[in-house]
Amino acid sequence: MTNNDEHAKKIFLLRDHGRDATGEVVDWGLNSRLDNLQAAILLHKLKTYKSDIKRRRSIAKMYSKGLSDISAIQLPPSPEFDGINFDIYQNFELRAKSRDELRNFLNEKGIGTIIQWAGTPVHKFKKLGFRDIKLPFTEAYFKECLMLPMNMGINDDEIDYVISSIRDFYG
């Protein structure tokens, strides 16, 4: 999957508890074996991942083009933004004023959305042992973040429906 010898060496270590070819542990690593079903799915995905990325980027472009003139929305940067961003758009997460109202509106129209981490910044998860710290930019972001539908099964008409519904909400 790589033509970089250093990356290949590191991946080799990571895949088996950080052990090198002699079995000596030389770095941190994992051991995550695939069962036959997972391996079969991965074999298929390795054949389609380039077209999957292309489709995800196409969906993201549709969202960006259809929503870019709405001042109440801040879109994620595109891969062309800085020349080094390689976003494959696993998610299409934007910032939206009146996020909760927008989410309810979309839900009433049959459009599912996700609020990352249930709208709670990770540093606020007390059960993880974090102190009570203030991160105002992070906290502001989490009050507005919203993920739009982004999957390989969604078609262009459905994307257009999401876009037109958001446009209707913001009038």
Functional labels for PLM-detected ranges:
Residues 3-171:
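PLP-dependent aminotransferase class I/II
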